[in-house]
């Protein structure tokens, strides 16, 4: 159970002075689902392991919390792990709605790009963060791309198209956000840093 900002207002946790300041627009707040700060998730894991393996590992983490003499922190940890399992299951359903099965690891560059994107899309749809970056994924994707080019199932031009389309998809996430986020900013900004290229 988590207390959201609107609950604080409704339950009168705010003092009368705070409520008056809110009413007069002196004190404002962001929507409860607004992700604050810069988040750089490891979206590669979806492509690398597949969702079923990630769910299996999280269920093992949950089972490892079964012990006698549980404390308050243990209950919170179990709740958080259960939320993570549910989120991974929801991501699998979301990908299926687009016609993809992400239960297994990506087998080629196209799948690696798509699986990685689904990880990012699931995160930004739930966090609504203005600054949720992708990070440096080019070295990771390059492994799949190089392998597919060597096999003759992908050309340099097609590889470039994959990356171009990925960048376009990152720019279009604004359409997946909830209305309360869009009320904050004009122009639906997206600060999604994607590092491509470089050495090391």
What are these regions (language model features)?
Residues 11-200:
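Mature, well-folded catalytic/scaffold domains that follow N-terminal targeting or propeptide regions
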Residues 1-9:
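Single conserved hydrophobic/aromatic residue that forms the stacking wall/gate
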